[in-house]
Amino acid sequence: MSSPPPARSGFYRQEVTKTAWEVRAVYRDLQPVGSGAYGAVCSAVDGRTGAKVAIKKLYRPFQSELFAKRAYRELRLLKHMRHENVIGLLDVFTPDETLDDFTDFYLVMPFMGTDLGKLMKHEKLGEDRIQFLVYQMLKGLRYIHAAGIIHRDLKPGNLAVNEDCELKILDFGLARQADSEMTGYVVTRWYRAPEVILNWMRYTQTVDIWSVGCIMAEMITGKTLFKGSDHLDQLKEIMKVTGTPPAEFVQRLQSDEAKNYMKGLPELEKKDFASILTNASPLAVNLLEKMLVLDAEQRVTAGEALAHPYFESLHDTEDEPQVQKYDDSFDDVDRTLDEWKRVTYKEVLSFKPPRQLGARVSKETPL
């Protein structure tokens, strides 16, 4: 059997958990960190700056048109994002020297250390930290929403946190209906807005605000707020707290099935949030009552939530970068596998790193 060709000049090869990695020589000390449905992540040290980075290798991104489309969208979304509370790209590279050879690419991002899910398992968070973490979630969401993107699947596991309690949102805009079919991974519904769970109607960016409310409540109480065993049970758990919606809301549902289901439910009164959220400050309770509203049209936006008195000590209007709308008209085009490869290769080669590569950037990098 012939041995594989030598590594590309300026690259080196290493086996990581039975997978061959070929990365740029500036990234040293590859250590496996974790793996998910679509790829594996290693930490590394950037030899130019000494900064720790996370490198993600997608599993066979061009195994099918569906996977190729997802890989292309992930790359374009990450390239678009330049905000301190949203994960962005420090670098992207391929060891493949031509389009014909192109099979893999690697995404380099800031290394964060942990995620909110792990953090909550290990310690009870105090009010100040909860306030700071929720503030950062909302700032990141305001930016993502201004770009015209809906996260759709915000949960503690995709909120990365470092040792300074700085937070970055991961995996935004990637949750599509096809995911479970592609990977067999079961999607957790506990943080999903009712209109997403039941496909009630065209949903808006406030689906993400519902998720923030669920996460904030969990940080306060140490327990998952709505822990349904399936989607109908999830809805029942939600309504035990929010109460059943008025008839006028039910009429607005686009699905007849959902309308009939809702009409058949016993009437439930809205609970007093303060009784569920023991130990929460009155301002925290008030903010949660504005986020966990069954009717999406009545839910606060990220910008409105940030202006809430709960964040008075943190609010800083100077801090907000402008964002261009993300053009997703390229993402849903039907292309052959070779066309997906070609457009992805072009995106990899056209990447320009943020100006302060790997350095700690206190203000957002302008687009």
UniProtKB/Swiss-Prot annotation:
Q: How is the cofactor bound?
A: Binds 2 magnesium ions.
Protein name stated in the entry? Mitogen-activated protein kinase 12
Q: Does the keyword Iron apply?
A: no
Effect of altering residue 185 to F? Loss of activity
Q: Which compartments is it annotated to reside in?
A: Cytoplasm; Nucleus; Mitochondrion
The task this protein performs is described as:
Serine/threonine kinase which acts as an essential component of the MAP kinase signal transduction pathway. MAPK12 is one of the four p38 MAPKs which play an important role in the cascades of cellular responses evoked by extracellular stimuli such as pro-inflammatory cytokines or physical stress leading to direct activation of transcription factors such as ELK1 and ATF2. Accordingly, p38 MAPKs phosphorylate a broad range of proteins and it has been estimated that they may have approximately 200 to 300 substrates each.
Q: Which residues carry this modification: Phosphothreonine?
A: 183
**Induction, as annotated:** Expression of MAPK12 is down-regulation by MAPK14 activation.
**UniProt motif (TXY) ranges:** 183-185
The organism of origin for this protein: Homo sapiens
**Protein kinase domain boundaries:** 27-311
> Taxonomy-wise, where does this protein's organism fall, top ranks first?
Eukaryota, Metazoa, Chordata, Craniata, Vertebrata
Q: Quaternary structure?
A: Monomer. Interacts with the PDZ domain of the syntrophin SNTA1. Interacts with SH3BP5. Interacts with LIN7C, SCRIB and SYNJ2BP. Interacts with PTPN4; this interaction induces the activation of PTPN4 phosphatase activity.
UniProt entry keywords in alphabetical sequence: ATP-binding, Cell cycle, Cytoplasm, Kinase, Magnesium, Metal-binding, Mitochondrion, Nucleotide-binding, Nucleus, Phosphoprotein, Serine/threonine-protein kinase, Stress response, Transcription, Transcription regulation, Transferase, Ubl conjugation
Chemical reaction(s) catalysed: L-seryl-[protein] + ATP = O-phospho-L-seryl-[protein] + ADP + H(+); L-threonyl-[protein] + ATP = O-phospho-L-threonyl-[protein] + ADP + H(+)
Entry PTM:
Dually phosphorylated on Thr-183 and Tyr-185 by MAP2K3/MKK3 and MAP2K6/MKK6, which activates the enzyme. Ubiquitinated. Ubiquitination leads to degradation by the proteasome pathway.
